[in-house]
C-alpha cells in the first residue's frame, strides 16, 4: 500500500524524470528528425525564427515506424518494418548514434531483427532497457540496453495479455510501471468490434508483471491510441483514436484508476463525423500547463473522376491543464493546413510544435482539383498555450510515406 511518504517520493521522481523532449539541464544541440519511408532525415532547428533546415539522412532496414531517444541524448532507437507479416516481413530495432557537433545520425551496431511489425518503442527512464510494442499479434517485448547504448538480448517475460492492436508502450515517470495502449478495432459488416484497453503492468529492471486492464464498458467504444504523462503530477492523458476524445486518468496508490476523471471532445464539429476522422498523437507541454492532441482526417470522395479529400478536421486541439485538478480545458483548434497529422512534437523549451503529415492528397480547388503535399507544419507556442502557424514545408514522399517525427536534445 502506498503511504504519504511513498506518494511524495513518486511525485518527486516524476518531477525530475527524463522525458522525450529532455529538460534543458545541460547544453545540447536541438535536432528534428522525420522519416520518408526508410530514410530518416535530420533537420537543424532555429527556435527564434521557427525554421527547419534539412541536413542529411540515414537509411534504416525498412520504413520507420517510431523512435525514442536514449536518456543521455546521444542515441536514438528506431523501429522499422515493411509492414508484411510472416516470411516476407522485414522488422528491426536499430540504434543511431547522434553527433552533438552537427546532429547527424549514423547506425551504431547491427540492427536487431524482430519477429513482427513494431508499431511503437520507448526506453525505461534510465534507458537501461528498450520496450517495443507490436500491433499484430498485439504485445510487448523488452531488450537490454548495453552501457555503449547498443542493444543486448531480449528479457524473458511471463505470460502477458497484449490486448488487441497495441499502439504504444510507455513507462511511468517513477520507472515502476508500464502501460501498453491497445486500440482495439471498429466493427465491420462481418466482424464484431474488438475491445480496446490500457494494460497496466508493474515494471522492474526490464520485467513486466501483475498486469490488469482499464477498459470501460469491457473495452467496447474505447479505442485508445496514445498517452502522455504530466511531468510533475500523477496525471495521465489519453487520446481515444476511434472516438476522437481525450481522457484524463489519475495514478493513485501505484495503480491507474479504472474510471477517467475527465472526458472531453477533441473535435470542433461532430456533425459530419466520418470513420476516417481519428484522434492521434498526444503530448503534454514541458511546463505541464497544456496538453495537445492531433485530429486526423483523410477520407475521400469521387470528384471529376478522381479521389479527393471529402473534408474533416486536420488540426491540433490545445487544452490548458488545471494545476489543481488536472482537468483539460479546450483553448484552441489550430488548423495544420495539411492532411493527416500523424505525429507531432514539442521542443524542450516549449516554444515550437512541429506536426508531420503522411501523404499528399487531391483536394477541391474552386471548380477544379488541387493537391496538398505531405510535409511539416511549424507552430509557435504562446505563453497562453495557443498555437500560431508560422510556416509549412512540403515534402516529396514519392511512393513512400512520412510516419514519425520528433525533437531530440542531442548532447555531447
Regions picked out by a protein language model, each given a short descriptive name:
Residues 61-72, 114-126, 160-175, 218-235, ...:
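Beta-rich, blade/repeat-based domains predominating
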Residues 44-49, 97-103, 144-150, 202-207, ...:
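Short loop/turn segments immediately following beta-strands, especially the blade-tip
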Residues 36, 85-90, 135-138, 188-196, ...:
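Short, solvent-exposed loop/turn segments at conserved positions within beta-propeller repeat blades
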Residues 53-58, 107-111, 154-159, 211-217, ...:
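A short beta-strand motif characteristic of beta-propeller blades
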Residues 56-123:
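Blade-loop segments of beta-propeller domains
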Residues 6-23:
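N-terminal export signals
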Residues 107-170:
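Asp-box/WD-like beta-propeller blade repeats and closely related beta-sheet repeat scaffolds
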Amino acid at each position: 500500500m502506498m503511504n504519504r511518504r511513498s506518494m511524495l517520493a513518486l511525485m518527486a521522481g516524476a518531477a525530475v524524470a527524463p522525458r522525450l523532449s529532455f529538460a534543458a539541464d545541460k547544453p545540447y544541440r536541438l535536432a528534428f528528425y522525420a522519416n520518408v519511408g526508410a530514410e530518416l532525415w535530420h533537420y537543424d532547428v532555429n527556435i527564434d525564427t521557427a525554421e527547419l533546415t534539412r541536413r542529411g539522412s540515414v537509411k534504416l532496414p525498412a520504413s520507420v515506424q517510431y523512435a525514442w531517444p536514449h536518456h543521455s541524448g546521444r542515441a536514438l532507437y528506431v523501429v522499422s518494418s515493411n509492414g508484411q507479416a510472416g516470411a516476407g516481413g522485414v522488422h528491426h530495432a536499430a540504434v543511431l548514434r547522434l553527433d552533438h557537433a552537427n546532429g547527424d545520425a549514423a547506425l551504431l551496431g547491427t540492427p536487431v531483427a524482430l519477429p513482427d511489425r513494431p508499431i511503437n518503442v520507448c526506453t525505461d527512464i534510465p534507458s537501461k532497457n528498450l520496450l517495443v510494442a507490436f500491433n499484430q499479434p498485439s504485445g510487448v517485448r523488452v531488450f537490454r540496453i548495453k552501457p555503449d547504448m547498443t542493444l543486448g538480448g531480449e528479457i524473458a517475460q511471463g505470460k502477458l495479455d497484449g490486448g488487441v492492436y497495441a499502439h504504444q508502450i510507455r513507462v511511468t515517470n517513477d520507472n515502476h510501471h508500464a502501460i501498453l495502449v491497445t486500440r482495439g478495432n471498429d466493427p465491420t459488416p462481418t466482424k464484431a468490434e474488438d475491445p480496446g484497453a490500457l494494460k497496466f503492468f508493474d515494471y522492474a529492471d526490464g520485467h513486466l508483471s501483475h498486469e490488469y486492464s482499464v477498459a470501460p464498458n469491457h473495452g467496447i467504444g474505447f479505442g485508445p491510441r496514445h498517452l502522455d504523462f504530466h511531468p510533475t503530477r500523477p496525471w495521465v492523458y489519453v487520446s481515444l483514436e476511434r472516438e476522437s476524445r481525450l481522457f484524463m486518468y489519475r495514478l493513485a496508490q501505484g495503480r491507474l484508476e479504472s474510471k477517467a476523471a475527465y472526458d472531453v471532445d477533441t473535435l470542433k464539429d461532430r456533425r459530419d463525423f466520418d470513420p476516417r476522422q481519428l484522434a492521434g498523437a498526444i503530448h503534454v507541454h514541458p511546463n505541464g500547463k497544456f496538453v495537445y492532441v492531433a485530429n486526423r482526417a483523410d477520407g475521400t470522395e469521387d470528384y471529376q473522376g478522381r479521389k479527393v479529400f471529402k473534408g474533416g478536421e486536420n488540426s491540433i486541439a490545445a487544452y490548458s491543464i488545471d494545476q489543481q485538478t488536472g482537468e483539460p480545458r479546450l483553448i484552441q483548434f489550430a488548423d495544420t493546413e495539411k492532411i493527416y497529422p500523424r505525429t507531432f512534437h514539442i521542443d524542450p523549451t516549449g516554444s515550437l510544435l512541429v506536426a508531420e503529415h503522411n501523404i499528399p492528397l487531391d483536394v477541391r480547388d474552386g471548380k477544379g482539383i488541387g493537391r496538398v503535399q505531405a510535409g511539416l507544419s511549424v507552430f509557435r507556442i504562446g505563453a497562453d498555450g495557443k498555437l500560431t502557424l508560422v510556416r509549412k514545408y512540403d515534402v516529396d514522399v514519392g511512393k513512400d510515406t512520412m510516419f514519425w517525427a520528433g525533437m531530440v536534445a542531442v548532447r555531447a
